[in-house]
Amino acid sequence: MKKDREPIDEDEMRITSTGRMTNYVNYGAKILGDEDKKSIKIKATGNAIGKAVTLAEIIKRRFKGLHQITRCGSTVITDQYVSGQDNSEHVVQEKTVSFIEILLSREQLDMKDAGYQPPLDEKYVKEMTPEEIVNSRPFRRGGFRPRFYRGFRGGRGGFLRRGGYRGFGDRVYEPRSSFRGGRGSGYGGNFGRGGYRSGGGMGGGFRGGFRGGFRGGRDGGYRGGNRGGSRSGFRGGRGGFRGGRALS
């Protein structure tokens, strides 16, 4: 069921969590670029509040002398829809959500208002036309790109040779290997490619030093060293440590 939408003024912007910031900045710049428009009002609810605050800060840094008044609180939103197989049941639901209203104006606003903010210092403002704002570097590629997807990599160190740890490289996620020990960070005589490696499957589990230490079998469990296990406790690699005699 469609519900009647409240009329929106020409100088008003209603921000949604799915809207593109580029479009909002472009529209806001066009409003303030008009000589007849002295103010702009930005409204948002719920998850879109953060985007509305970001939009206001961008506009304030592109137009000089903008006074600001911010109001926030909670409001009740009513959703109406029909249910049932024959769409005969009329359902009304009410929910309380947070909202924010940001008024930016070239004219002086009430300085006694609790949400009043004076214009930014001109040294922090770089005036641009609407076209220059959209074509500027932060917006040419549709916003910023975070770098967390590159994972992390430990430096040299760890245990003897090239220890440390490695993240999941340049891939977002690789289910076969979550993290991998660096070289030489496990038990074993020669300290070859040791460390530990997570993940199941064949050859998974823990992998110790150079053919020694702990090594996970195909079905999990432990397999000691080269020929360890039930015959001789557990046995490390070359130069590692060796358990006692087999139990009779």
UniProtKB/Swiss-Prot annotation:
Main location: nucleus
Subcellular location: Nucleus; Chromosome, Telomere; Cytoplasm
Single GO MF descriptor: DNA binding
Consequence of gene loss (knockout): Attempts to knock out the gene were unsuccessful, indicating that disruption is deleterious to parasite intra-erythrocytic growth.
Keyword Glycoprotein: no
Pfam families for the chain: Alba (PF01918)
Keyword set, alphabetical order: Chromosome, Cytoplasm, DNA-binding, Nucleus, RNA-binding, Telomere, Translation regulation
Keyword Cell division included in the entry's annotation: no
Source species, domain of life: Eukaryota
Signal peptide positions on this chain: none
InterPro entries, per database record: Alba-like_dom_sf (IPR036882), Alba-like_NAB (IPR051958), DNA/RNA-bd_Alba-like (IPR002775)
One GO cellular component, as annotated: chromosome, telomeric region
Chain intervals for the UniProt region annotation (Disordered): 217-248
Family annotation (SUPFAM superfamilies): AlbA-like (SSF82704)
Similarity annotation: Belongs to the histone-like Alba family.
Annotated function: Possesses DNA- and RNA-binding activities. During the asexual blood stages binds to a sub-population of mature mRNAs and regulates the timing of their translation. Binds to DNA with relaxed sequence specificity. Associates with the subtelomeric TARE6 repeats.
Subunit structure of this chain's protein: May form homodimers. Identified in a TARE6-associated complex consisting of over 30 proteins and including ALBA1, ALBA2 and ALBA4; the complex binds to the non-coding subtelomeric repeat region TARE6.
Name of the protein: DNA/RNA-binding protein ALBA1
Species for this entry: Plasmodium falciparum (isolate 3D7)
Gene of this entry: ALBA1
